[in-house]
Amino acid sequence: MHNTLDKSEAKERVTFLRNELHRHNHLYYIKDAPEISDAEYDRLFRELAELEALHPDLADPASPTARVGAPPTGDLATVTRTIPMLSISNAFADEELFKFDERVRRSLQTGDPVTYLAEPKLDGTAVELVYEKGRLVMAATRGDGVTGEVITPNARTIGSVPLHLTGDAVPMPNLLEVRGEVVMTKEGFEKLNALRLERDEPLFANARNAAAGSLRQLDSRVTASRPLTLIAYGIGRFSEIDAISTQHEIVTRLADFGFKTNSHVRWDLDIKGVIDFYRFLEGIRPSLPYDIDGMVVKVDRLDFQRTLGATSRSPRWVIAYKFAASQETTRLVAIDVQVGRTGALTPVALLEPVTIGGVTVSRATLHNEDEIARKDIRVGDAVLVQRAGDVIPEVVQVITGRRTGNETPFQMPATCPVCGTPVVREPSEAVTRCVNAACPAQVKERIKHFAAKGAFDIDGLGDKLVDQLVDRGMIASYADLFTLRVEDLESLDRMGFKSAQNLVAAIEKSRHITFDAFLYGLGMRHVGAHVATLLARAFPGIDQLAEAALAGQLNSIDGIGGVIAESVKNFFSNPENRQTVDSLINHGVALQFPEKEAATGHEMPLAGKTFVLTGTLEKMTRDQARQRIEAAGGKVTGSVSSRTDYVVAGEAPGSKRDKAEALGVAILDEAGLLSLLEPGER
């Protein structure tokens, strides 16, 4: 496309791209308020680089392609570093990584093997820490690579930043400059935003922005209150550099000095091994405690690094292989209001289709009316949409600079968009609800929940089939499912005799159900799978549970708070709900109850013990581990305290392991947990 531009058109386009990239650099580095996604920035940057390559006479030393980032703000003192913190060139496909390998080998012209170190590309804020004779004397942000902002008081508040280097087994250097990434865990980010929501403060768009904003505070007490972690990955100047010959030795030495380093680092890899590791990181990405946006690949030998050198922007011995974008910019064309199984009205953004992470996204959650108002989201807005793993895409930010004046503010409807019943919003809730329990939308969603895994688990009863059954008047309640016959189902779309036969068999099989799955399937508000398990353990049957709930006795059960107790009480106070339960029993639903074992018996080896799970386990998921612990009489909580008996730490355990160590709580690996669950099992 660029080959078709004449000289004046190319010059005009180059000027536009440079101005745009400078503006976005300033918004990203200085204001901590980016307007576009990383992927969109990368596209603009690549377009400019291609144009400059085609028209070398348009080269400019002040071009964004010749610079590392943006200049620092004047609010904090600045420092100029001797060895710049350069940017890293990006790759977006396997082919580009193979070309990188070819360039490296062609430049080195060596008969020695060329191997690589690969590590996750942390999505945080880069910093440099300077140590003299083992003491932290200065910390600075990356800034524009050469000049950074001094943040020493703030860095000292981060628990993972050593104030003094440790390690008796290695000589203490006179000078060491450590490069690392300050990140905020996903859990810490969610808790921080929840706290800011309570205080009516603006929410951070993502953990990276939260980390950057926390580091650049003028008041270090604010930084101290934020859940930040430093993960070290490299060095600048080092007085003992002659004793080190590889990049992986640097990582090992940093760990010896007391720094937290990335547990997912691999070395001695050829380029095919590097690509295999990239696939591995893609797979574990959702389960990591912190955000990563790709993989960094470095030539391992330091003498090879020195031979390869660097351009004005980036080293030639390193490249970042980035994941497919998790954020993209698109336009919000309409807002649809959906009705859930509890009557909650949820606004959903209808978007111009955009590809995020290899998936086409045309809808995104807007959460509720208050979130729309807080973010000032309007129909017609250009918006930043985020998709993380299997999480429903969400609109995280409005790009107000692109508004035309034709955008329309959103207003929640006064009546249910499905059944027309006037909607209600309680003063204490952020949710507007349709109060008509017979609303077809609520009926459909309740039955879908009832039939889902973890509840009645009716194989073959998908969402579209439920919609058909309700729309045709064939079912209106849970119990109606147990009256369906093969001949009834054959008339439905895409439902032949064999499929109908299989579905009837699956419904029949679901009649035999454990008490906890039954309770979960009823769809009581605030009663998820875990709460259902707690309730099922506490009572020998549905009648005893209902009696205790109506008497206000559920608060005495460990793990059941006031909100849950009130919700269960309200459920059983409604005669229609009692009738629903009775109808299911009358239609042959048979509840199964686990045999009660003595708390001290062999079958309940974890009775009275409290566990916290963190990191990625190898032989089972964390949810499976929770189920096994609870089945053995143990209790699983979400946070570490002095009352915790064990922390089970898998790969990339995060801050929970650190807290356990600080409190003296016993830490188990997966094999240790298995030995408690089943002596002799590994």
UniProtKB/Swiss-Prot annotation:
One Pfam assignment: DNA_ligase_OB
GO MF assignments: DNA binding; DNA ligase (NAD+) activity; metal ion binding
Binding, Zn(2+): 416, 419, 434, 439
A single GO BP: DNA replication
Boundaries of every BRCT domain copy: 601-682
Transmembrane intervals: none
UniProt cofactor(s): Mg(2+); Mn(2+)
SMART domains the UniProt entry points to: BRCT (SM00292), HhH1 (SM00278), LIGANc (SM00532)
Chain residues that bind NAD(+): 38-42, 87-88, 119, 142, 181, 298, 322
EC category: ligase
Record InterPro entries: BRCT_dom, BRCT_dom_sf, DisA/LigA_HHH, DNA_ligase, DNA_ligase_CS, DNAligase_adenylation, DNAligase_N, Hlx-hairpin-Hlx_DNA-bd_motif
Active site: 121 (n6-amp-lysine intermediate)
Keyword Zinc: yes
EC number of the protein: 6.5.1.2
Domain of life: Bacteria
Keyword vocabulary terms for this entry: DNA damage, DNA repair, DNA replication, Ligase, Magnesium, Manganese, Metal-binding, NAD, Zinc
Cellular component GO terms held in the UniProt record: cytosol
Keyword Metal-binding: yes
Catalyzed chemical reaction(s): NAD(+) + (deoxyribonucleotide)n-3'-hydroxyl + 5'-phospho-(deoxyribonucleotide)m = (deoxyribonucleotide)n+m + AMP + beta-nicotinamide D-nucleotide
Functional note: DNA ligase that catalyzes the formation of phosphodiester linkages between 5'-phosphoryl and 3'-hydroxyl groups in double-stranded DNA using NAD as a coenzyme and as the energy source for the reaction. It is essential for DNA replication and repair of damaged DNA.
Family, per entry: Belongs to the NAD-dependent DNA ligase family. LigA subfamily.
Name the UniProt record assigns to this protein: DNA ligase
Organism name: Desulfosudis oleivorans (strain DSM 6200 / JCM 39069 / Hxd3)
